[in-house]
């Protein structure tokens, strides 16, 4: 049965919007938890499947288990958002919940070992990411359809809080469950996914307006292949190549990057020619949409890779130096990062509500300015810091991200015409998710550049001091920097594996004890790691400052106005098109720019021709 959501302003509509909010918040929370839950659980997963991720040949599995979920989300989110516009956002969202749940179950029934088990997890994570893409691509559009303009900031704010909080909840949940059984980190999502699937099918209803258009197959293929090549090139660029610490000069990396960029260029040309493009380039003529996405892109680049750096800093150096065993560092790293979650939980909902009244610009801009200043503050922390100032900076950084994320997301969605919200949300998601992967590539590159020159010399001197033979010390000192970073990320002590019994058994007992103890490798890594952090935090501060500048340029509060579709009327089973008027929630100095429409950056007003809307068959209103 084709069901439509109730008429706005009725009790049924009021109940429906809260059902939509709670269900989409659950979906976003599950997706974000599964983006981060493996960061902490990886050591137990690799031990469980009997695969050593520090062996160069196995680095593929480490990278793709971590990044495969994000890569597929970045590639598919705009396509699936567009499908939501064409065939119903709720229908695509419901399908996503079901797909996500099925692959969560499949991930937990892996009884293989070695590379076969690693390949299975990579494949199932990609499938799980496809389900997550359906959820991510359509949740914002569903909320924007369900809530009136003066409540969208609040609704999207709660949704954003769930998304960011889930990243940190995933760290703690992974640390708690993985030591019991690594399969629990996957199966834990299944009951919640089943609940969300049944709930969504029972309660969520599609908007009464759909877009009538053909699928842009050429655009979809060019975009998917081009972006995949670029992101794959980035993941391999941070790995060693020959005698180089990184692979940016590798023909394979250069070929994938150049090939991907060429295909994306062709994609841009195709999208400007076809009648119903997947990527509606005209949307970038809307000032609020363009500025909001640029700010989101820069913010994601500035902070996306930092979670990994904080985890490596805590797991690989700070916690071992403070007496925590390597096997316990993953859980405690997640716990020590909770102040950032607390800051975001405080600021996210409040800024979303206030942005409904005062507009996004003051909150999003100040959030990025504060975030930039916190990265400057991190520059002044010693590598073996006192936890109190670290926790304060983490909390302020989370608060800053909360100030930015909710208002910025609401401003982007408010700027879109109703029949383009799925595609627009997908385009915005592409920027955010691709920027997260790009950010990790940038931050890993900066970290490797920072430690590559000092690490070999530091390792050699430390090993020789503990009476390790020169030949063995020389071999270990050529440890690729990326291996050191991965060891820190995984909470591994690589010395016992790198030296092996053949060397350790011939050393004095005291030297062998020092080399395999908690503090030897973290102490040696501390100085080179600090050099890398300086470069990374400086980059993060600059990126967030540029995001603040983009946020300033978004202009005053703006909500897209569009005429009602032909034949639409206010009756049960139909949906009124959005109307934008000045109201009591709009301040005189922050007018709603309904007439400004698109072309604001060019200084003129123009109309964005929507695809032909299709009115769904009339049906009785249900909740």
Regions found by a protein language model. Name each.
Residues 2-201, 351, 378-379, 390:
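Transmembrane-helix bundle of Major Facilitator Superfamily
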Residues 21-33, 37-70, 251-255, 263, ...:
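Transmembrane core module of solute transporters
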Residues 179-294, 302, 615-623:
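Hydrophobic transmembrane-helix bundles of small-molecule transporters
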């Amino acid at each position: 049965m084709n069901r439509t959501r109730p008429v706005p302003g009725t009790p049924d509509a009021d109940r429906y919007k809260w059902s939509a909010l709670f269900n989409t918040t659950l979906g976003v929370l599950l997706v974000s938890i599964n983006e981060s839950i493996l960061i902490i659980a990886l050591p137990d997963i690799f031990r469980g499947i009997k695969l050593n991720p520090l062996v160069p040949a196995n680095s593929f599995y480490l990278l793709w288990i971590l990044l495969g979920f994000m890569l597929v989300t970045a590639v598919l989110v705009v396509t699936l958002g567009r499908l939501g516009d064409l065939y119903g956002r709720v229908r695509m969202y419901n399908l996503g919940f079901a797909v996500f749940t099925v692959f969560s179950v499949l991930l937990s029934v892996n009884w293989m070992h070695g590379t076969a088990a690693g390949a299975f997890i990579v494949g199932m994570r990609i499938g799980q990411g496809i389900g997550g893409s359906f959820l991510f691509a359509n949740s914002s559009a569903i909320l924007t359809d369900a809530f009136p303009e003066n409540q969208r900031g609040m609704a999207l704010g709660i949704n954003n809080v769930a998304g960011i909080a889930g990243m940190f909840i995933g760290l703690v949940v992974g640390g708690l469950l993985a030591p019991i059984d690594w399969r629990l980190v996957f199966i834990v999502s299944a009951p919640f996914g089943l609940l969300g699937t049944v709930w969504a099918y029972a309660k969520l209803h599609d908007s009464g307006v759909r877009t009538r258009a053909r699928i842009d197959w050429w655009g979809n293929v060019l975009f998917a292949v081009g972006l995949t090549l670029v992101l794959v090139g980035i993941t391999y660029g941070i790995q060693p190549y020959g005698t180089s610490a990184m692979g940016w000069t590798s023909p394979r990396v250069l070929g994938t990057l150049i090939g991907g960029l060429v295909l994306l260029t062709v994609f841009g040309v195709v999208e400007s020619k076809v009648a119903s493009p997947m990527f509606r380039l005209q949307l970038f003529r809307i000032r609020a949409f363009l500025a909001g996405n640029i700010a989101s892109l820069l913010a994601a680049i500035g902070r996306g890779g930092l979670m990994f750096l904080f985890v490596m800093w805590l797991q690989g150096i700070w916690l071992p130096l403070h007496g925590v065993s390597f096997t316990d560092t993953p859980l405690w790293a997640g716990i020590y990062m909770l102040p950032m979650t607390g800051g975001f939980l405080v600021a996210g909902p409040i800024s979303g509500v206030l942005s409904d009244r005062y507009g996004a610009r003051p909150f999003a801009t100040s959030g990025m300015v504060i975030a930039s200043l916190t990265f400057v503050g991190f520059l002044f922390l010693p590598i073996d810091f006192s936890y109190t100032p670290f926790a304060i900076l983490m909390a302020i950084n989370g608060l800053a991200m909360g100030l930015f994320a909710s208002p910025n997301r609401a401003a982007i969605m408010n700027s879109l015409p109703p029949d383009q919200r799925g595609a627009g949300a997908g385009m915005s998601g592409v920027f955010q998710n691709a920027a997260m992967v790009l950010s990790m590539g940038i931050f890993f590159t900066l970290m490797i550049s920072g430690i590559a020159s000092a690490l070999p010399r530091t390792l050699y001197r430390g090993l020789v001091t503990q009476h390790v033979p020169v030949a063995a010390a020389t071999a270990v000192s050529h440890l690729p920097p990326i291996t050191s970073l991965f060891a820190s990320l995984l909470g591994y002590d690589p010395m016992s594996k790198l030296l092996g019994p053949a060397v350790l058994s011939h050393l004095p007992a005291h030297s062998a004890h020092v080399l395999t103890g908690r503090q030897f490798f973290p102490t040696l890594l501390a100085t080179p790691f600090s050099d890398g952090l300086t470069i990374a935090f400086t980059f993060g501060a600059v990126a967030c400052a540029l995001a603040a500048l983009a946020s300033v340029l978004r202009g005053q509060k703006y909500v897209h106005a569009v005429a009602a579709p032909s034949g639409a009327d206010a009756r049960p089973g139909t949906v009124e098109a959005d109307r934008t008027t000045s109201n009591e929630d709009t301040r005189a100095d922050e007018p709603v720019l309904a007439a400004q429409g698109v072309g604001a950056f060019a200084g003129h007003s123009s109309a964005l021709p929507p695809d032909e809307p299709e009115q769904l068959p009339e049906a009785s209103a249900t909740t």
